[in-house]
Structure formats: structure tokens, C-alpha cells
From Swiss-Prot:
Polar residues: bias regions: 656-667, 684-694
UniProt feature, compositional bias: Basic residues: 609-626, 781-797
Keyword Phosphoprotein: yes
Organism: Drosophila grimshawi
Quaternary structure and partners: Interacts with Pp1alpha-96A, Pp1-87B, Pp1-13C and flw.
Name of the protein described by the UniProt record: Protein kintoun
Amino acid sequence: MSATSTRNKHSKIHGNEKVDITKDEFARMRLALQDEEFRKLFFDYVDEIQDPENRKIYEQEITQLEKERGVDVTFIHPKPGFVVKTAIDGELKCFINICGSQIVERPNNEVAINSETGERGLTWSIPMAQAPARDDIDANKKLCKVFDVVFHPDALHLGTRNSQFRKCLIDTALDGVEREFNVNLDRANLKYPKLDYKGEPHATVIRKLSKNATAEEREPHPLEHTYPKKPEANAGKPKVLPMKKNVTSTPTFAVPKYSIKHSHDIDMAQYTDELDAKLQVTIPRALIVEIELPLLSSTADCQLDVTEKSVYLLSERSGAKYRLKLDLPYTVDDKSGNARFDTEHRRLCITLPVVRSSAREQRQMHDNVRILSREDSGVELNSNSESPAEDEEAGSEAIVELTTMQQTQTDNFDAFPPRQSFLKRDLHYQMVANFDCNIVENVMAFLLHVPNVQPDSMRTVIREGRSVHLQFASMGSGYYPTNYAFLVQLPDAADPQLHIDHVEPDASDDNVVLRLFMSESCMTLPSYLAGPDATDLTEYACFPPCKTNIEDENCDLELDKPLRISTYHNELNKSIEVTIIPQDISEQVHQEQQQEEEEEEEQHEQQQHQHKKGNKKQRKRNKKQRSLSESAFEDLKAEQQQQHQKQQQQQEKLPENSSPESLNAGSSEPVATLKLPQRKQRSFSECNDSSSVQRGILKRFSRYGPRPSISESSSSIDDCSSSYSCSVDAAGIGFSHSFGGIPEERVIADAELSESCKKTVRFNDHIMKKMFRLDSSILGQRKKNQKRRDCKLRAQQRRVSEGDSVDYEEVEHASNGQQTANKTAANAQYFKQPQNNNNRSYSKNNKNQSLHDSGLDLTNNNNHNNEEDTKRNEADAKNAMIFEMDDDDDEDM
């Protein structure tokens, strides 16, 4: 039923007969179609009608029947040409088939001269035939209308060769459809689909009276009412339509259909008996503007501009060009509105809230209504006067005051003419939101930041030489103009002789420049007034105040004394600070600043030293250290006391006038035995209080890169053995360094370290890299590398324990009591393992044999004690290197 209703609705709109069917008829048709035999007969009937041979027989019978009535019938079979697509009344889609037939007469032309211009040309006469409109469906299965317009094939051929003649054919077809069927076609949105013919071709019938009809044929037929009405006598003559004299240009844009609805809210306050209950009843809450856009599927190509009093719509899409400019009956809030496009009905709905009067205006209106509705009782109330004379005096004073106020208002209106004298009443003017003012000599220039200003719309007026009023229009993005007004007025405090001579406005694409030429220099002008009109002016300063940082403006500088000028650039605030003080004061201030900076640096260093905590590597080193047992510590303490006594005896034997240089040169004891500030080294035992060593800055080496030479970075060995001359082989990489070639000064107790104790660091250019295989996981490689490092570490410890155990046993049982006995005991305690026990037994059985060859050159003329000291120092150096390797492996793990 919905499809039938839709078809009937459109048929009724466009003049066709409405199909009226009852429920009984519809039920019978439904039952009949359920019968298989009826459906078979119905399909046979359809095939018979569509058969071309049967159509010819049908046309012959119709021709014979009409001839018996004295009517000649001619069937026109249209041949496809091309199709024009448009819309009817902007709502229903429409197709016009431009066809050809030999029955239609050929187009002819005549030579004619234009009476107005005198030009010579051709006047064409183009015959055509039209068929009644029929319903069809488009590609989206929606209802549409189809019209057939038939021309001679020669006319179609000329249209294919000449574009102007083709346009003439299209205009002729559109005019014929609009005239015959009383419809409005959308000529601004014509489309030409790739079709030769829309729908199934239908034959068109031309009916006219027979010229040689007999008397019998002219007699009325008994069944005349069942046949079509006979044509009139002049029906056979073709209609000749004169050419349009005033040819209307084809519109570029179509005007869509629209409607404005007033939306109200139900407010219960309007149903009370208050006087102001219905003051806003006639003003709607919002305006709803509905615009029909049947040729648009979305509003992506639409431009919509909404102002307080108008709505402007523009669509430049090919085949769907719309333009609408609509004035609104009420002032609306364009910032709070919303728009929604209904894709099903192709309708744009715009909701705009109406701006109502403010609370102040409503209150004033309420008071006025209350005053007007007050009834006069004839009795005067609240009279404070005691006699009629006082009333007369009060009345006279009131009259004088009122007259004065009226005179003042009249003067003001005379000084400033009303706004309507220059600005138009029907336009809404806006104030320029952003502008700048510059003053140079007698020129006052205003830069108004308004783009796309039309130069033709600029108008200026000078009022009494004290103010200038400017109005102009700017074209927005939707080609909708916006009007602006700008009034500049000189303040009352300005010089009375200063006035405006003339004005030069200049408009560009980005802004407007307004130059005011004064009668004299206006550099001293403090301010000016600006606004849209004389009733709404705001005061602006010509020169903004400068920012100064002068704290004391009353300070006097003595010019006789030399001055110190300093500047400070502040990039953050974009400012410059200039300080001017006398020279003597500046020196004192400079010294005080230096002292304060030094104190701050010392405090900062102390805080860092106090809050400094050991990192993760230091904690790992501390975990690796092992403490000695109590028994070993007691033995070391006893040996240390014996050593201290021997040192005191040796110092007493030395001559009193001996210098530190002679001690260093003649003494067989190493320099490290002298008293220096005690500093601890991880590679030696912490029980040795007399050791004075310093740890190298770049001691910890990487396991995966080449170890740097001792010449590049100082290590712990040169700190402890600076007076020895030795050669060390570490981790299979041979490198040597002379520890005795660098003379170092050693100061006895309570002396500071000399410059020779400072470390010099040199960095190598070698870059350490870590490679990973692509076909294995990182965790798997890490476990393998860790196992490999553990095996290497155990092998190195095993070799050292087997090769150096003899040296440790000799040092442990030595009775000379030298300085490094405690270190040897600590190392022996640290490396106590089953293999070491076997080495000790082996070393006891071979005491008289030569010691293990460690690669050190020990041949000298010193006594036996010095040789033993040298051996112990070599063993300590090797142990230190082993500890360093151990630490490096732990870090890698």
C-alpha cells in the first residue's frame, strides 16, 4: 500500500488521474493472483501485448476504428537520441528523452536581419512532437518522471555537429515540457547521463479530423462517450510559438525551497494573571529553517553562513548548484545555532535560538506596564508640601531642570548627528575587532585588520573637524558581505586648534589603512576615542607607557666620579637591565659578589660530599672484599708494632741535617713507608695503615675490548709502587712501565700531597662494540658468556695459586718485619684453598731452592732484606691486577 500511495501522491501532484481502489477490489486481486491458472493467463496477456506483431495489428485496428469516426490517427515511433536529467520543482527527479522520427517535419531557416543591431543571421523553425508524461523508476528504485520530445533526425544530426544548435534543441524541449505540463524545471542543474533513451519506447499518437470524411462518418456514434473526444477542426495545424524577444539567461544557481518555523516552549508562567506574563509570548524561542536539497547527498560541498539577521547557503557542486539568501524575522544567536542534514529526505534543518531582550529591558518594560495600568483614584498621596505655594515653587524648579536637560540633550544631538544620517537603518554594522594606531608628525594612521574589503563600499565623513566616521563592507568566505563602522573622535582634552583637515582611506586584501591628516603636529595627543558610533566610544592611549625598572627615581648620580655601567639581557622577558654605579662602589660590590659565590660553591661541595652515596659498582666491590679472621689480625698487629719500632730506630740513626731528598736517595726502604695521609686501595689489605696509595681514575677496564696501556691511564700499581722499577704481564697482554723514573716528593707527617700525586687521564679513540647473533636469543648468549667468563676466571686463579704459592709462603714465614708483611698475610688469608695447602707443603720442602721466576728484574747490590721486599711488592702488584680482573668480570655479569 505504501508504494501505491506514493505513486498516487505523485500522480495527483502532476495532474494525472488518481488510482482509486477499494479494499474489496484489492482483496479480489490478491486472491486471483494466488491462483496459478490466473497467473498463467495474466503472463500470456502481457507477452501478447509486448509482441511487436501484435502491436502492429493493434495500431491497424485503432487506425481503422478512428477512421470510421472521421479521425485520422498517426503513430510516431521515437528513435533514441540523448537524455537530459533535471528535477521538477526541485523535488522530483525528471528525465527528458530527445528522440527522432521521420514523421516530424524537418527544421528550416530563413535569413533575417536584427532590427536593433542591424546584424544579419538565420531564423530557425524547429518542429517537434511531445508525448504525455509517464512514471518510471531510477537506478535507486525511486519514482521519477519521463517525458519524450521528438524532433526530425536531421535536427539531431545538426545538434551533434554544432554545440549552439544542440543547446537550442535542449532549450526548445525544456520550454515545451514546462508549457504543456505546467511544471518548473531546474535549468541550473542539468545533467547528461550516458543513455540513449530512458525506459521502454512508447509510440506517440497524432490525431486530427479527416479532410474527406463522408456524411456517415461525421454522424455521432452511439458509443461516442466511450471513445476519446474528437479533435477540433484546427487541431491538425501545428502550433507556432514566436521567438522570445527578451531571452532570459540561464541561471547559474537554483533557489531551493525553504520554510521558516517558529518554535515555542510551554512556560506555565505565561498562563498566570501577571501583567508581564505574556510579554514574550509572541517571540519564539528558536527559528527552524528547513531547506530542501534533493540533488545533494551530503553537505560536504555546501557553504553555510549565519548572521544575526540572515542565512546564506551556497553549493557549487556540478549538477547541484544552489544559492539561497534568506532574511530572518528575528535577531538570532549565530554562535549557539546548529545544523543537521537529513540524508533520507535530502533536507537541511537549521535551528537558531532567538535573542530575547535582556533582564534590564524586561524590568524596564515591566515597570512601564505597571505604571500605565495604574488607576488614578483622584487622591494625592505622599505629599510633603505644607502649602500650595511650596508646591508651585517645587513645580517651577522641576520645570527649569527639565528644560535644562532637554536643552543639553538637544545640544548633544546637534554636536553629533544621529546614526541614521550616515549609516543605513536596514543594515547591521559591526565594530572592528582589532586595529592599530600610529602617529607621525601631523598624520594619524589607523590599521584596521579586516580582510577582503570592497573598495567601492568605503564611505567617510568628517564632523566639525573633530571626528571621522568610516563604513565599509567585507566579503566573507560564503560571498556574504559583512558591514563595519569605525568612528574616531578627538578627546575634549586635546588642543582646540587641532582639527582634521582631510582623510585618505585605502583598502587592500588583508587590511584597511585610514590616514587622518591634522592641522598641526599631533605627537602630544594623549589619547583618542574609537567605536562603531557616537553612542559607543572607548578611550585608547596613543602611546603605551614604557616599562622601567628604576626603583628610586630621586637618586642623584655624581658625575665627577667615574661610573661603572653594566647591562643584562633577559631573553625570557625580552628586556634589558642597565645598572649605573660609581667605580669604587662597583669594585666593592664585585668583591662581595665574588666572596658570596665562593661561599656558595664551598657549601655546595660540602652538601654534595655529605649526600654522596656509593653507586652500585662500589657496593659490588664491597661485597667482594673479605674480612680477615681474628687470629690473623692479631698476628698482623704484632708484626706491625715490630715494624714501627724498627722504623723509629732507623730514623734515630739518621743525621739530623739530612733532607727529604737525601732520605729518598740513600734509604733502601721504599718511599711508600714514609708517613703520608692514609688512603686506602682495594687491591691491598685494609689492615696496612702505613700504605699511601691512590686508585687510578680509569682503573676498571672492559672485558671485551683491548686493555689500555698504563701510559694512558694511571692504575693502582703506580700509586703504590712509584719508586720501584718493574715489568708486569697482565692477562696475557704484555705491557711495561717504569715506576721509578718519575721523581715524587714525599713530605713527612701532616704535609699535603704534591702535584705529582695528581692523575692525568688520556682517553683512547677505540670504540667498544657488542655484537649479537640474529639466530639466537640475548638471554642464551648471556648465559654462555657468563659460563665462559667463570671458566677463565677459575683457570687464572688456579694458575696464580699454583705459581705464586711459594712466594706467599716465603713472605709469610719471613722474619725481617718489613712494611708489607701485613699485606702478604692478608693475601695468604684470602687465597687459602686446598690447592694452596699443597703448594705450601711443596714450598717448605724446597726452601733452599730458587724462587719462582715472575719475570721481574731483581738483580741489584742491596742486602737480602731489600730483595725479599722487592719480591713481596711484585706479588702484591700481581694480586692487585687479579682483583681488578675479578671486578671487571663481575660488572660484565
